[in-house]
């Protein structure tokens, strides 16, 4: 079953967010097949730097245009770089400056794709927008629910949890009912230019650059000490912002006497002392948390939290659903997990589910230590 198409689809004008990737390309094609009046829109959300780094935006625009030409639809372009800088990138920098690890894709969806793009599309006369996200929607009892995508390997509801039901109600997700290989097969069948194009990975405005090189353009590095849980200094870091909880690579620790062969992991970031706390072993007790505190909660639809709720949650993308109890506190929300969770990271998002329904989520403020810690 695909996104329900109303009987008068020919009267419905849909503008598809065309990224230059295969998912949005096939989304536009499927909507044409369903009888909608379809147009595309390519968003430029970042002004590339003046320098040697090459931004892929021009390639993506060319691919989007090639697909639109092939399937016979108009392609609009819009520049949301100012909105992106103000509403996404400045927050991204502020979070890293505060020693946290943000997820700009979630803010981008809320502020750009389902706000700036949605408003722009409506200004162009659209009835609906569409994107190539692997999620589904369901209209029930006067509200619109956000559901997980049918392909568990590609489900993107984690990234859309902060988008409200009113925005979801104005959006179609044509590939949400499909698995990725099916989408590729459709693109190849119709000989779309994006059929074999690799999926984009990483943060859009960084591209192929090293993350540390990009970040130091905007934030001054503050080197400090690397310490063990016992307080022994075993190295120096270039800045807490370059490290995240659970990180193994790039610590520059090695050859320590009596340290053994187990790899080192980031366990804590002490902002007061600018120290990076590390320990050995993939299952070091300090890596685990029994609960978390969250703020900046966004619900797709209002929910009743007058009593604690039994739900499932994800503390990172593609994590399997984790059983928890969610309750409202005086300062935010607290989720207590049935099983200890590894590498719960402040600044990242926790997203709550009721079965296949994505309820919403928020920003992790505090990871409460597991009682198994020494």
UniProtKB/Swiss-Prot annotation:
One of its GO terms (biological process) is tRNA wobble position uridine thiolation. It is found in: Cytoplasm. It catalyses: S-sulfanyl-L-cysteinyl-[protein] + uridine(34) in tRNA + AH2 + ATP = 2-thiouridine(34) in tRNA + L-cysteinyl-[protein] + A + AMP + diphosphate + H(+). One of its GO terms (molecular function) is tRNA-uridine 2-sulfurtransferase activity. The record marks 133, 348 as: Interaction with tRNA. The active site is at 108 (nucleophile), 204 (cysteine persulfide intermediate). Keywords: ATP-binding, Cytoplasm, Disulfide bond, Nucleotide-binding, RNA-binding, Transferase, tRNA processing, tRNA-binding. It comes from the Bacteria. Residues 154-156, 316-317 are annotated as: Interaction with tRNA. The keyword tRNA-binding applies. Residues 103-105 are annotated as: Interaction with target base in tRNA. ATP binds at residues 17-24, 43, 132. InterPro entries: MnmA-like (IPR004506), MnmA-like_C (IPR046885), MnmA-like_central (IPR046884), MnmA-like_central_sf (IPR023382), Rossmann-like_a/b/a_fold (IPR014729). Its EC number is 2.8.1.13. SUPFAM superfamilies: Adenine nucleotide alpha hydrolases-like. One of its GO terms (cellular component) is cytoplasm. Coiled coil: none annotated. Catalyzes the 2-thiolation of uridine at the wobble position (U34) of tRNA, leading to the formation of s(2)U34. Belongs to the MnmA/TRMU family. HAMAP family: tRNA_thiouridyl_MnmA. This is tRNA-specific 2-thiouridylase MnmA. It comes from Pseudomonas fluorescens (strain Pf0-1).
């Amino acid at each position: 079953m695909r996104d329900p198409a109303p009987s008068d689809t020919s009267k419905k004008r849909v503008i598809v967010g065309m990224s230059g990737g295969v998912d949005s390309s096939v989304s536009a094609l499927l909507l044409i097949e369903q009888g909608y009046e379809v147009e595309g829109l390519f968003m430029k959300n970042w002004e590339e730097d003046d320098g040697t780094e090459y931004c892929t935006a021009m390639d993506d625009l060319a691919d989007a245009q090639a697909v639109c030409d092939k399937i016979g639809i108009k392609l609009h372009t819009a520049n949301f770089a100012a909105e992106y800088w103000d509403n996404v990138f400045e927050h991204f920098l502020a979070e890293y400056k505060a020693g946290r690890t943000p997820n700009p894709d979630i803010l981008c969806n809320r502020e750009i794709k389902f706000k700036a793009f949605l408003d722009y599309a409506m200004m162009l006369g659209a009835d609906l927008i569409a994107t190539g996200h692997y999620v589904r929607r369901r209209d029930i009892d006067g509200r619109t629910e956000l559901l997980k995508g049918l392909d568990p390997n590609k489900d993107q509801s984690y990234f859309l949890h902060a988008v409200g039901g009113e925005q979801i109600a104005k959006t179609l997700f044509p590939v949400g009912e499909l698995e990725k290989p099916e989408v590729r097969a459709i693109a190849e069948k119709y000989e779309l230019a994006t059929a074999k194009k690799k999926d984009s990975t990483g943060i859009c405005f960084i591209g192929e650059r090293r993350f540390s090189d990009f970040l130091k353009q905007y934030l001054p590095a503050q080197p400090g000490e690397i310490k063990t849980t016992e307080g022994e200094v075993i190295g120096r870091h270039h800045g807490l912002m370059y490290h995240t909880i659970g990180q193994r690579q790039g610590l520059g620790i090695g050859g320590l006497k009596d340290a053994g062969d187990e790899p080192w992991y980031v366990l804590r970031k002490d902002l007061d002392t600018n120290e990076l706390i590390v320990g050995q072993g993939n299952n070091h007790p300090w890596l685990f948390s029994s609960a978390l505190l969250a703020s900046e909660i966004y619900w797709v639809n209002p929910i009743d939290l007058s009593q604690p709720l039994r739900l499932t949650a994800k503390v990172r993308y593609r994590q399997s659903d984790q059983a928890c109890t969610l309750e409202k506190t005086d300062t935010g929300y607290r989720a207590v997990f049935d099983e200890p969770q590894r590498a719960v990271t402040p600044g990242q998002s926790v997203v709550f589910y009721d079965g296949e329904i994505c309820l919403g989520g928020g920003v992790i403020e505090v990871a409460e230590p597991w009682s198994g810690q020494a």
